[in-house]
Amino acid sequence: KLSYDDKVFENVEFTPRL
């Protein structure tokens, strides 16, 4: 499974970085 950071990195354009 992908970790939270991996998902955020993969969807960096969609998910804003906190």
Curated annotation (Swiss-Prot):
It comes from the Eukaryota. GO terms for biological process: neuropeptide signaling pathway. GO terms for molecular function: neuropeptide hormone activity. One of its GO terms (cellular component) is extracellular region. The keyword Glycosyltransferase does not apply. Keywords: Amidation, Hormone, Neuropeptide, Secreted. Its main location: secreted. It is found in: Secreted. The modification Leucine amide is found at residue 18. InterPro entries: Pyrokinin_CS (IPR001484). Belongs to the pyrokinin family. Hormone that controls sex pheromone production in larvae. This is Pheromonotropin. It comes from Mythimna separata (Oriental armyworm).
